[in-house]
A protein has these predicted regions:
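N-terminal helical cap/lid subdomain that shapes the substrate entry/recognition surface
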Residues: 3-103
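Asp-based, Mg2+/Mn2+-dependent phosphohydrolase catalytic module
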Residues: 1-8, 83, 106, 110, ...
Length: 221
């Protein structure tokens, strides 16, 4: 069966992740709290967020904004910082709606011979603003908020398939996360390409590309 569409992740794939903003927030926490090693802040914050993230599903689902703000509050409390959680969160949210874009992203959308659907772990309002900000025109946008489930769960992929009227074998998914994108897509029976922009070691059995337009070569019979 021929490929009829691309699914693509957004943050880290089409646009830059919020790593630089997180560095700034971590520094503020270090400057206002009791921190011996800045890496401790990053580790605690990430683990706390991931714990809530993995338990956010169905009736217990919470938006990405809610999870980020809660994990930030927990991190401020853990390190005795008097910084304002809402103020720090707003720095992240500002990035989410106006993130810098990778140079190959617009050419990918403009030159793709197939429809491109965005499939992302993010709140719907934020990604729609980011897509409009960069004047991108995907065939559809599906978010964790829509599915009430985050990747690497298969629910978001299955929602995208149903909504687009596609079978798993008719889609190639592209994303920058081996766990969320490659393994998550596999759970839904979708072939995935790992977007390895930074030359990392490629895990065995994983198909990878270094730039988005390289995906077009995988459409050849």
């Amino acid at each position: 069966m021929s490929i009829k569409a691309f699914f693509v992740d957004f943050y880290g794939t089409i646009v830059h992740e919020d790593g630089e903003v997180i560095k700034k927030i971590t520094k503020i926490i270090c400057d206002t709290g009791k921190v011996e090693d800045p890496s401790e802040v990053d580790s605690f914050w990430w683990r706390d967020f991931q714990t809530m993230f993995m338990n956010s599903y169905g009736e217990t689902f919470e938006t990405q904004r809610s999870l980020e703000e809660k994990s930030l509050v927990h991190t401020l409390e853990r390190f005795g910082s008097n910084a304002d959680a809402k103020e720090l969160s707003s720095m992240m949210f500002a990035h989410w709606i106006k993130p810098p874009i990778f140079e190959d992203s617009k050419p990918f959308f403009e030159n793709s011979p197939l429809p491109v659907y965005v499939v992302s772990n993010i709140d719907t309002s934020d990604i729609l603003q980011a897509i409009a900000y960069h004047d991108l025109h995907p065939a559809g946008v599906f978010t964790s908020e829509d599915a009430k489930s985050y990747k690497p769960g298969k629910e978001l992929f299955e929602l995208a398939l149903r909504s687009a009227g596609l079978m798993p074998e008719e889609v190639i998914h592209i994303g920058d996360s081996v766990s969320s994108d490659v393994q998550g897509a596999a759970k839904a029976g979708i072939r995935a390409l790992w977007l390895n922009r930074f030359g990392k070691s490629v895990p065995e059995g994983v198909e990878s590309i270094s730039e988005l337009p390289e995906a077009f070569a995988f459409l050849s019979p």
